[in-house]
């Protein structure tokens, strides 16, 4: 067994060898606790027939644990300076491919087809860059990739919002946007002390498992998300007031908004944070004829 990359001493050795300095703009925080990494991989439930997609491998700390568990690992790295480092640290593993690309611009489905032919169980497993966590998740969900789900590390505050239930202060349009596609829960919390350099916030690993069917069927998915975003324009305001302010030409359609709320059996005095995803689905369908133009 090779020495783990994710120890303080080994990480320092690698950084010194390559004269690597962290780029704050890329949100680079490397894990230095192999036990955390083993737990992350364990939550992904990978087998020798699984594939793993990683975003931001850094110096390969999580990548090597994935390589030990999965049939194939594909890691997307935006920072060109890390390519020779990864070539070195991951040289013992012949089942890893590094793709030098911004994940937000990558054709991930094409990469999966080319790099993982015949692999039916695929998970996204990553320590996500905190500054682009939400855009990465939404891109990968919207791309409808042939994956089972995600086990990903992120800022604890964002994890709380993603997994929030109706009626809580964390619940909002992000909760609905993610939970429309997946069942979401927090697998573990991670202290800031296990990173180099230490971030200012604690982290959490969340598990997102794709639904077989969405929790609500709607006329138009994009419009559902337009309605949910509008419903949280100002959290202290009622759903009725927020829809007027947040929907295009909402001020001129007050009566229709009231009719749509009644059709969806939603009191206009309620706040967006109290509505379930099923209620948002009914509301979006009721609003669709006038606002989806």
Swiss-Prot record:
Please name the NCBIfam families in this protein's record. Answer: ksgA
Pfam hit, one: RrnaAD
Q: Which reaction does it catalyse?
A: adenosine(1518)/adenosine(1519) in 16S rRNA + 4 S-adenosyl-L-methionine = N(6)-dimethyladenosine(1518)/N(6)-dimethyladenosine(1519) in 16S rRNA + 4 S-adenosyl-L-homocysteine + 4 H(+)
Q: What is the lineage of its organism?
A: Bacteria, Bacillati, Bacillota, Bacilli, Bacillales
Query: What's any one GO cellular component for it?
Result: cytosol
Key words of the record? Cytoplasm, Methyltransferase, RNA-binding, rRNA processing, S-adenosyl-L-methionine, Transferase
Keyword Coiled coil listed: no
**What is the name listed in the Swiss-Prot or TrEMBL entry for this protein?**
Ribosomal RNA small subunit methyltransferase A
| EC number, as in UniProt | 2.1.1.182
- Which compartments is it annotated to reside in? Cytoplasm
Q: What GO molecular functions are on record for this protein? A: 16S rRNA (adenine(1518)-N(6)/adenine(1519)-N(6))-dimethyltransferase activity; RNA binding
Q: Does the keyword Transcription regulation apply?
A: no
**Which SMART domains did the record assign?**
rADc (SM00650)
Under the heading InterPro entries, the entry gives: KsgA/Erm (IPR001737), rRNA_Ade_diMease-like_C (IPR023165), rRNA_Ade_Mease_Trfase_CS (IPR020596), rRNA_Ade_methylase_Trfase_N (IPR020598), rRNA_adenine_dimethylase (IPR011530), SAM-dependent_MTases_sf (IPR029063)
């Amino acid at each position: 067994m090779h020495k783990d990359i994710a120890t303080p001493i080994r990480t320092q050795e690698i950084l010194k060898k390559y004269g690597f300095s962290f780029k704050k703009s890329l949100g680079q925080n490397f894990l230095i606790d192999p036990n955390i990494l083993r737990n992350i991989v364990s939550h992904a439930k990978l087998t020798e027939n699984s594939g793993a997609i990683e975003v931001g491998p850094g110096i390969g700390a999580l990548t090597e644990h994935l390589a030990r568990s999965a049939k194939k690992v594909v890691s997307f790295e935006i920072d060109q300076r890390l390519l020779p480092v990864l070539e070195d640290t991951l040289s013992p593993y012949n089942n890893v491919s590094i793709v030098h690309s911004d994940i937000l611009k990558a054709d991930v489905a094409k990469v999966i087809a080319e790099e993982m032919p015949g692999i039916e169980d695929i998970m996204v497993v990553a320590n996500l860059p905190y500054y682009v966590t939400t855009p990465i998740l939404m891109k990968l969900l919207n791309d409808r990739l042939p994956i089972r789900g995600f086990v990903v590390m992120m800022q604890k505050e964002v994890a709380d919002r993603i997994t929030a239930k109706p009626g809580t202060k964390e619940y909002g349009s992000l909760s609905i946007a993610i939970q429309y596609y997946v069942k979401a829960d927090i697998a573990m919390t991670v202290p800031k002390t296990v990173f180099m350099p230490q971030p200012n916030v604690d982290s959490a690993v969340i598990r997102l498992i794709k639904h077989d069917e969405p929790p609500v069927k709607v006329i138009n998915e994009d419009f559902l998300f337009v309605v949910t975003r509008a419903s949280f324009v100002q959290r202290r305001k009622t759903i009725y007031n927020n829809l007027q302010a947040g929907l295009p030409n909402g001020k001129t359609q007050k009566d229709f908004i009231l009719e749509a709320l009644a059709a969806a059996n939603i009191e206009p005095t309620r706040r967006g944070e109290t509505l379930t995803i099923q209620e948002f689905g009914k509301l979006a369908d009721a609003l669709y004829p006038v606002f989806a133009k």
